[in-house]
Amino acid sequence: ISFIGSTRTGKKIFENCSKTIKRMTLELGGKSPTILLEDANFKDAIPHIFSSAYSNSGQACHAGSRLLVPKHTVEEVEQLLLDYIHTLNIGDPKSETTQLGPMINQKQFDTVQSYIKSGIDEGAKLLCGGLGKAEGFEKGYFVKPTIFICHNQNLKIVQEEIFGPVLCVL
């Protein structure tokens, strides 16, 4: 049995599997990183970083919601991210041209908003996005695609899975 998800659910699976000595692999409570090495072509990497972080509006366990970059490249990466994020097509997730759709429901929208507020309150640098609905999408649960620059790995937004379109750059 393989499971990726919350620690609470993983404990239940572990308890049930241990009763019958089943083999299992559990990845619990992690937050998937994308690592951008300094010998990479940054401009070519940016679309893949966005695809990893914002695919399914970030509502996936495998979303690459942490971007680890060499410290001396942060400013260059910031600019490339800003240039690219403004090209994202937000809209109907059934459309082939849409790159970012809404959250699944109001509860998830509110959860993502609370994480964004936490990032702001804890001092992460808000590069773009932030609280509220994406411009032009007052109906539905469209979160602004958000990027934080984080100089502290202990922030809640760095440590916990958000399941929304929020990218943390470290």
Predicted regions and their residues:
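Periplasmic-binding protein-like
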Residues: 1-4
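ALDH superfamily catalytic-core signature
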Residues: 6-152
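Short, solvent-exposed loop/beta-turn-alpha elements that line the ligand-binding surface or hinge
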Residues: 158
